[in-house]
């Protein structure tokens, strides 16, 4: 077997083109690219406005089975498929999310594809990139500062300090900041109250940026944020604090999508980064809709498995933005099938056909779930060197028994040459007109019924359970006019249940709803289930321990 290069070695050896050249490939004039160095740029708002009349290309969603520690390669497949479509003569753009610093220094490592299916410049994308996350964090925390400042200077709006619901954020995993008391230290520092931090990717400002259609829409949504309640339970909005204008100013440049390139010099839009387990998990609407005006095909991903990312992509992003996906790709691996079939991580390299067959139940559930949205799907088997022909065939046979097709993909090792078959299959599906996309539930359905619909139809649980205070809160929001909003489920990504260790395709479980949060600006209700946290912690040995600068000043250990 040939020597296997690391992702970073491959990325550093990339022959990148000037970003203006990449823009020209999809019709973006140089004057409408705002460069950040030679290999990344923002696309001007004027250009985005100018292409609104163009015909839309076809939208392809890449999703996956429930993630395992073995790794599925969803971003890698998204990037590979974009390259593959360009290889077979289609004009394609990849749309993915920006990486969060917290997980990069925690457990995940870099997020820009892998092998010969990567987006570059990888190091920049995994660190500060073009400053979007900084802008989002700053806008969010400006609002936090304005709340406490308003209370300090007399509290004219009558904010009940026990009912401030706007928490602070930072782009780092730090469990010590989850719950805290702020404004300690005497009269000069304000009125002490309970508060806390979430990670930036869970911020409502992040969700708003990713769902806004333009700057005007952005400012309106920012004004709609509910920051606190008065003693009579009436809401206090960000616009009551006159925060929306200044927040929009901080986010003006961050609203513009970022253009970068794949290893094969094809265009990629990287913009926004909400997590899919604690937020809606999709890149920005502006990036996706702009890409659709410039390409025949737009390949995008939604975070984690189809039970989380794809459900939110369909029920939140597509519903809000009027998008109609033409086809879906479900990424799965032999290794993950074995893990779902009960094999331990250290034994995944050994052939075990029975475990593959047993673990396929998880894949089957995701295939059924995508069908519920009326979108035709194909399974991409992301190839690992340890996979045997018999194991691959067992997966293909299972998918065929479900009435779908599985295609073996070797883009990690071969780039676009290893994914041509999938590219052709996706084109055939998209061009067939078979997609009859519809969200899972109507707008008018009561909020708790929406939760139960997802629990029963997607997770195959028996019901959602919630105490009276949660149900009363949902009812109060319905009475206040928020009943038409979609729900955004926050739960573990590792299982259809709320137990991360319950793999495979469980049925009949209950899903406990711990807390609900109204994101009035983003336009959804967050449903926090089980033990999921909106501020993650670092593991015992965080990946930051292995990250350093070598003697040449290059970054080591980030990927």
UniProtKB/Swiss-Prot annotation:
Swiss-Prot/TrEMBL keywords: ATP-binding, Ligase, Nucleotide-binding, One-carbon metabolism
Ligand binding (ATP): 68-75
Annotated catalysed reactions: (6S)-5,6,7,8-tetrahydrofolate + formate + ATP = (6R)-10-formyltetrahydrofolate + ADP + phosphate
GO biological process, one term: tetrahydrofolate interconversion
Gene Ontology MF term list: ATP binding; formate-tetrahydrofolate ligase activity
EC annotation from Swiss-Prot or TrEMBL: 6.3.4.3
InterPro entries: Formate_THF_ligase, Formate_THF_ligase_CS, P-loop_NTPase
Pfam families per UniProt: FTHFS
CDD domains: FTHFS (cd00477)
The keyword Ligase is assigned to this record: yes
Listed pathway(s): One-carbon metabolism; tetrahydrofolate interconversion
Domain of life: Bacteria
Family annotation (SUPFAM superfamilies): P-loop containing nucleoside triphosphate hydrolases (SSF52540)
Family: Belongs to the formate--tetrahydrofolate ligase family.
Entry protein name: Formate--tetrahydrofolate ligase
Organism for this UniProt entry: Mesorhizobium japonicum (strain LMG 29417 / CECT 9101 / MAFF 303099) (Mesorhizobium loti (strain MAFF 303099))
Gene field: fhs
């Amino acid at each position: 077997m040939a020597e296997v290069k690391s992702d970073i070695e491959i990325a550093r050896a990339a022959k990148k083109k000037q970003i203006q050249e990449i823009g020209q490939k999809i019709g973006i004039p140089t004057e409408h690219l705002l460069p950040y160095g030679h290999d990344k740029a923002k696309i001007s708002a004027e250009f985005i406005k100018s292409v609104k009349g163009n015909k839309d290309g076809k939208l392809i969603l890449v999703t996956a089975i429930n993630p395992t520690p073995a790794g599925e390669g969803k971003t890698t497949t998204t990037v590979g498929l974009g390259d593959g479509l360009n290889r077979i003569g289609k004009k394609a753009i990849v749309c993915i999310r920006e990486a969060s610093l917290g997980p990069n220094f925690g457990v995940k490592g870099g997020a820009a594809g892998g092998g010969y299916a990567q987006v570059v410049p990888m190091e920049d994308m995994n660190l500060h990139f073009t400053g979007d996350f900084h802008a989002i964090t700053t806008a969010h925390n400006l609002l936090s500062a304005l709340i406490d400042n308003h209370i300090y200077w007399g509290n004219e709006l009558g904010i009940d300090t026990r009912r401030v619901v706007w928490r602070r954020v930072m782009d780092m995993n730090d469990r010590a900041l989850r719950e805290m008391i702020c404004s300690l230290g005497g009269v000069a520092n304000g009125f002490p109250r309970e508060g806390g931090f979430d990670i930036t990717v869970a911020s409502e400002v992040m969700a708003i940026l990713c769902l806004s259609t333009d700057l005007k829409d952005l400012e309106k949504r920012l004004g709609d944020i509910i920051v606190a309640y008065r003693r009579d339970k009436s809401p206090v909005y960000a616009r009551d604090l006159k925060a929306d204008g200044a927040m929009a100013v901080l986010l003006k440049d961050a609203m513009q999508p970022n253009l970068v390139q794949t290893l094969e010099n094809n265009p990629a839009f990287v913009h926004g980064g909400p997590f899919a387990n604690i937020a809606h998990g999709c890149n920005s609407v502006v990036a996706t809709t702009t890409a659709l005006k410039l390409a025949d095909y737009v390949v995008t991903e939604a975070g984690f498995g189809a039970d989380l990312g794809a459900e939110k992509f369909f029920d939140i992003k597509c519903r809000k933005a009027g998008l109609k996906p033409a086809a879906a790709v479900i990424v799965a691996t032999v290794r993950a099938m074995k893990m779902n079939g009960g094999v331990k991580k250290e034994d995944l390299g050994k052939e075990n056909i029975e475990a593959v067959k047993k673990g396929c139940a998880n894949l089957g559930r995701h295939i059924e779930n995508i069908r519920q949205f009326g979108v035709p799907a194909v399974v991409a088997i992301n190839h690992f060197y340890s996979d045997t022909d018999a194991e691959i065939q067992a997966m293909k046979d299972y998918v065929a028994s479900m009435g779908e097709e599985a295609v073996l993909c070797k883009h990690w090792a071969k780039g676009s040459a290893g994914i041509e078959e999938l590219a052709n299959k996706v084109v055939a599906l998209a061009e067939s007109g078979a997609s009859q996309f519809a969200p899972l539930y109507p707008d008018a359905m009561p909020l708790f019924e929406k939760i139960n619909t997802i629990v029963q139809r997607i997770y195959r649980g028996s019901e959602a359970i919630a105490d009276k205070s949660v149900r009363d809160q949902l009812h109060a929001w319905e009475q206040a006019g928020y009943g038409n909003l979609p729900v955004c489920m926050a739960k573990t990504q590792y299982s259809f249940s709320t137990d991360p260790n319950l793999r495979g395709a469980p049925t009949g479980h209950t899903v406990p709803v711990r807390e609900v949060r109204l994101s009035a600006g983003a336009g959804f209700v967050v449903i926090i289930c089980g033990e999921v946290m909106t501020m993650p912690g670092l593991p015992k040995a965080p990946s930051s321990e292995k990250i350093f600068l070598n003697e040449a000043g290059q970054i080591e250990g980030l990927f």
